[in-house]
């Protein structure tokens, strides 16, 4: 790859005051900077304590200096780390000294970008650094660390190797049709293809779970007017986020509240009550509610347990089921259990439907059941040593690869079209390569690394 030769420098610790502050330098001038600031040649990978001096010999600070010659460093280049006191003025003076010695100020994420360009880590691992820093729960941090250590990349690389093997068989059958063994016709290729599809499906499911832990789950509260949707939002948020009255149709727009349950991020959306109406403003609210339902990761379908139609709420709203055809993502909330006399509990039906009876306003009875249920939906405490962190772009790439394999299988089974299957396999491999950076445009790399902290 085209690795830049400029030397870069930046403050690597968070803004503000602290006990320790770190300046990081990477590039061909790092060794020269070390000698100028410390006053002597540093032994590689040893901690050297002493004063940090400016161009006139005046002491700027004192602390520990570490020198890592490339390629045995984080970036793969010569790297210098100066660990001094964490005052912003002191750190800025030390940074200015590095810039005077020929370094330039690093862009956000440029150290990680250079590590990627020097093959010290792949793109998924580089992104995991930012995910680890921004983790909002212990579970998300553990997943990000596993991705940084290569758990996700190994799964993708294994899929890629299987795709390459499959492509070899397909290309051989196309290029040498006169051979006695026809891999396309004897079922060997189809079996290999189905094996890759099954493994890809597993990785996609696990990546989806990892993305929820990283980005948070979008939970939409839906139901008829006056079922207690806004009361449920307030109970989950722990504050009066929505206006609650006895008047049906009080909520006319989509309300969004960001909450955490044991550190797990949730984006809770309260919607207008679903009903036929002639009110233009309320109609817009209903349309927005249906749109939110279609985009949700989890839907809390709230019904008034005291109403006679609460016995079979799904039969009431065909438009609801049209927006969310996957019933596995719907949790039925029987609200107002304090008035109906329903016991506070969580029940799972034979077909997997979960129903929770609670009271959103009566001291939040049953709310803890709902919180635990939402945590379970996000995969809280259900991850294994192989689980990993993932991003939305990773999911898009995995889905693209999956779609290509599905299309290729149809071409093979319906038309025996080996050439078209070969192209679909190529596209699937390229989609997987976008995850680790084997196939990545400069624009994509720029967007990814610009989201990092300066000094990372």
Swiss-Prot record:
GO terms for cellular component: cytosol. SUPFAM superfamilies: P-loop containing nucleoside triphosphate hydrolases, TrmE connector domain. (6S)-5-formyl-5,6,7,8-tetrahydrofolate binds at residues 24, 81, 120, 456. Its cofactor is K(+). InterPro entries: G_TrmE (IPR031168), GTP-bd (IPR006073), GTP-bd_TrmE_N (IPR018948), GTPase_MnmE (IPR004520), MnmE_dom2 (IPR027368), MnmE_helical (IPR025867), P-loop_NTPase (IPR027417), Small_GTP-bd (IPR005225). Keywords: Cytoplasm, GTP-binding, Hydrolase, Magnesium, Metal-binding, Nucleotide-binding, Potassium, tRNA processing. It comes from the Bacteria. K(+) binds at residues 226, 245, 247, 250. Homodimer. Heterotetramer of two MnmE and two MnmG subunits. This is tRNA modification GTPase MnmE. The lineage of its organism: Bacteria, Pseudomonadati, Pseudomonadota, Gammaproteobacteria, Pseudomonadales.
């Amino acid at each position: 790859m085209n690795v830049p030769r400029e030397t870069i420098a930046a403050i690597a610790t968070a803004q503000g005051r602290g006990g320790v502050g770190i300046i990081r330098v990477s590039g061909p001038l790092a060794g020269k900077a070390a000698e100028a600031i410390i006053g002597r040649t540093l032994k590689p990978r040893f901690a050297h304590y002493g004063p940090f001096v400016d161009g006139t010999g005046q002491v700027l600070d004192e602390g520990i200096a570490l020198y890592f010659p490339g390629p045995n460093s984080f970036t793969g280049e010569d790297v210098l780390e100066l660990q001094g006191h964490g005052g912003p003025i002191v750190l800025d003076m030390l940074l200015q000294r590095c810039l005077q010695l020929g370094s330039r100020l690093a862009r956000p994420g440029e150290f990680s970008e250079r590590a990627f360009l020097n093959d010290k880590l792949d793109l998924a691992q580089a992104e995991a650094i930012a995910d680890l820093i921004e983790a909002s729960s212990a579970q998300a941090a553990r997943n990000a660390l596993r991705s940084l250590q290569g758990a996700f990349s190994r799964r993708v690389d294994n899929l890629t190797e299987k795709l390459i093997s499959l492509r070899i068989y397909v290309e051989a059958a196309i290029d040498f049709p006169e051979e006695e063994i026809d891999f396309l016709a004897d079922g060997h290729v189809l079996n290999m293809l189905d094996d890759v599809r099954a493994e890809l499906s597993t990785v996609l499911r696990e990546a989806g779970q990892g993305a929820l832990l990283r980005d948070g789950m979008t939970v939409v509260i839906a139901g008829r007017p006056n079922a207690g949707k806004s009361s449920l939002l307030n109970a989950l948020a722990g504050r009066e986020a929505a206006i609650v009255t006895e008047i049906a149709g009080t909520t006319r727009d989509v309300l969004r509240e960001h909450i955490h349950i044991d550190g797990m991020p949730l984006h809770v959306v309260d919607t207008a009550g679903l009903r036929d109406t002639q009110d233009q403003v309320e109609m817009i609210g209903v349309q927005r509610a249906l749109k939110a339902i279609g985009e949700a990761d989890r839907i809390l379908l709230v019904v008034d347990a005291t109403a006679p139609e609460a016995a079979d709420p799904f039969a009431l709203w065909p438009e609801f089921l049209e927006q969310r055809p996957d019933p596995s993502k719907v949790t039925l909330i029987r609200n107002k259990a304090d008035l109906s006399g329903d016991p506070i509990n969580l029940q799972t039906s034979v077909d997997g439907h979960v129903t929770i009876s609670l009271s959103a306003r009566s001291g939040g009875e049953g709310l803890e059941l709902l919180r635990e249920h939402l945590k379970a939906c996000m995969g809280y405490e259900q991850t294994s040593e192989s689980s990993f962190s993932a991003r939305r772009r990773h999911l898009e790439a995995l889905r693209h690869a999956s779609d290509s394999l599905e299309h290729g299988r149809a071409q093979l089974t319906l038309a025996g079209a080996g050439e078209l299957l070969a192209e679909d396999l190529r596209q699937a491999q390229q989609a997987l390569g976008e995850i680790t950076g084997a196939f990545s445009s400069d624009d994509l790399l720029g967007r990814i690394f610009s989201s990092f902290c300066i000094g990372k």
